[in-house]
């Protein structure tokens, strides 16, 4: 008997990915070294994401140590300590575009699927009427024109599955019964007769992009220099810092609003997160803002996650503001060279930097 066609499975890496439409994609790699980029490229091909839009997306997985969601580093090797089980990932929007309607139609649908999931999970709290407006356009996009023969009572949940979720206490600030809400959405669906799939998707995104926390990712567990618990809100505009409203994770009073054009440099040191921020238009005064995460075993992981998320978002601002990027890089190098951070303390450090000269 010849064994030349038999191969060892010890080097076979299996990955299972949940796509944005909740379908599953499985793929295997039969080589010793697999980069995150290798998996991401296959997923983008499956999801039909064109190369010029792939920067908006990423792959998430659950950190086995602290149970939090982490972005897969595409430039590093995928390592697995499990020899027989597949690695599990979620394809997700990493950075929301400022105007998703300008993207290609297939990518718009992916963005909308992500937003619908976030709304249903309670990441946004919407008035009932706005909730219904989004759903009305979404139903038109997914199911086409209303048809009384096919769209019987209960059709929204039956045909849309997890993407249909009536307002609840976690995703809406209003009260309405499921039956009343279904009638509300059905009437809106009827009113959209003749609207194409592309038009309905764009209309739904047009509402979503005006939401207060559109494109924002929240990071909890931070503490400022006064010992106050804070929440970090990272978006394509910058980093907002809120006081924690209550023990149930919720943003309260706005403490700071740092725009990307003013954030010179960011880094973390164990559980501490630092930002060099330019104060005033002349940029001669730079302040170091320091925060720390809870003194738990995994505080350093929370700090790293915030840094990765912030850098992903700031990159988009710099791509659209090249001259500003040059200025910030010059100031960043100058700030780092001064090494004025007070090690082990959270708070403010005032630095005085000369104005950067761009050549």
Please state what every model-predicted region is:
Residues 1-4, 12-13, 26-27, 43-47, ...:
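Eukaryotic intrinsically disordered and solvent-exposed regulatory patches
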Residues 7, 11-21, 228-237:
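PDZ domains - specifically the beta-sandwich core and the conserved carboxylate-binding loop
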Residues 19-38:
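Short, contiguous acidic and Ser/Thr-rich linear segments
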Residues 22-24, 66-67, 246:
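Detector for glycine-centered tight turns/loop "hinges" at secondary-structure junctions
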Residues 32-50, 310:
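Short amphipathic, charge-patterned alpha-helical segments
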Residues 46-66, 130-135, 273-278:
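Short loop-to-beta-strand transition segments
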Residues 61-63, 71-242, 328-331, 351-356:
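FERM/ERM/4.1 membrane-cytoskeleton interface domain
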Residues 100, 223-229, 235-359:
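Eukaryotic low-complexity, acidic/Ser/Thr/Pro-rich regulatory regions of large signaling scaffolds
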